């Protein structure tokens, strides 16, 4: 395990969320739900409350040299079974640089030290970059399922949709995408 002195994470606070407004934007219609669209103070406060007041959840910001470049979530924390659902969102300006993998290495080590035994996550089939990262970290694919596509309707005229057409299904004029559950056994595989 490498040490990354330029990368760190800590518990999220409201002041952190105001910096998310300065992040880049995903251009691909496949990833629009990852764009931080809240602009007003009221909307940002509501977003923070919505995320951090969920029971059995924890949120952390990702920092690179003190600049906030993303966040991590732990949801559905089960203290008895010592498992939780992992989420990660990066400022699009910091994607494809290996940062996601590096911060996840640090975060998974932290979770193991906290006594977590199993971490699971969900990834859309079309999010090949993320799936490759998770597999490199030792996550195993468990099963696939259909979910309502969160970013509008399928449009085969757009290259991102066309190149990933096997990831989508239209049912009763509604767009669904395939996603998968993946998990990592921290005791055995980390």
Where do the PLM segments sit?
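A short beta-loop-alpha structural element at the N-terminal edge
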Residues: 7-22
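Conserved acetyl-CoA-binding loop-helix of GNAT-fold acetyltransferases
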Residues: 96-110, 132-136
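C-terminal "cap" of GNAT-fold acetyltransferases
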Residues: 117, 147-190
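Helix-loop element at the rim of GNAT/NAT acetyltransferase active sites that forms part
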Residues: 3, 22-38
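Acetyl-CoA-dependent GNAT
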Residues: 14, 37-95, 104, 175-189
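A short acidic/small-residue loop/turn micro-motif
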Residues: 76-78, 145, 149
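Conserved acetyl-CoA-binding loop of GNAT-fold acetyltransferases
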Residues: 135-145
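Conserved beta-strand-loop-alpha-helix junction that forms the acyl-donor binding cleft
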Residues: 110, 121-131, 147-157
């Amino acid at each position: 395990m490498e040490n990354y002195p330029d990368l760190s994470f800590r518990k999220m606070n409201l002041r952190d969320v105001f910096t998310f407004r300065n992040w880049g934007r995903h251009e691909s219609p496949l990833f629009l739900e990852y764009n931080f669209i809240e602009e007003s103070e009221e909307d940002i406060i509501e977003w923070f409350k919505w995320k951090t007041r969920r029971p059995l959840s924890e949120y952390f910001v990702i920092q690179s040299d003190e600049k906030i470049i993303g966040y991590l979530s732990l949801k559905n924390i089960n203290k008895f079974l010592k498992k939780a659902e992992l989420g990660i969102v990066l400022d699009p300006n910091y994607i494809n640089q290996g940062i996601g993998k590096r911060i996840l290495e640090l975060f998974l080590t932290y979770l193991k030290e906290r006594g977590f035994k199993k971490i699971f996550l969900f990834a859309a089939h079309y999010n090949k970059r993320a799936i490759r990262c998770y597999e490199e970290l030792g996550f195993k694919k468990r099963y696939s399922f259909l979910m309502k596509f969160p970013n509008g309707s399928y449009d085969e005229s757009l290259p991102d949709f066309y190149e990933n057409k096997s990831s989508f299904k239209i049912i009763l004029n509604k767009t669904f995408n395939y996603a998968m559950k993946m998990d990592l056994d921290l005791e055995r595989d980390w």
